[in-house]
Amino acid sequence: MANIKSQVKRIRTNEAARLRNQSVKSSLRTAIRSFREAAAAGDKDKANELLVSTSRKLDKAASKGVIHANQAANKKSALSQAANKL
C-alpha cells in the first residue's frame, strides 16, 4: 500500500478506470462477435446493421482512450472487408 496521499488516490482512480475500461472492452468483443456470427450466417441486413453499431462503439472506445485509434481503424477495416464479401 502506498504511503503518499496522491498515490493512494491514483490507486483508487486507476481501479475505477480499469473496471470502466474492462466493461467497454467486453461490450466491444461482444459486438464484434455478434457481427462475425451474422456475417458467417450470411445475413447481409443484420451484418450491415451490426457493422454500423460496432464501428460506432469502436470509435467511442478510441476517443475515450480505451483502445488506440489505430487499433479501432484496423478493426473497422477488417469488419468492413468482411461485410463487403457478403
Curated annotation (Swiss-Prot):
One example GO MF annotation: small ribosomal subunit rRNA binding
Record has Nucleus as a keyword: no
GO BP, one annotated term: translation
Cellular component, GO annotation: cytosol; small ribosomal subunit
Keyword Repeat attached: no
Family matches, as InterPro entries: Ribosomal_bS20, Ribosomal_bS20_sf
Keyword tags: Ribonucleoprotein, Ribosomal protein, RNA-binding, rRNA-binding
One of the Pfam families matching this protein, by short name: Ribosomal_S20p
Main function: Binds directly to 16S ribosomal RNA.
Similarity-based family: Belongs to the bacterial ribosomal protein bS20 family.
Protein name: Small ribosomal subunit protein bS20
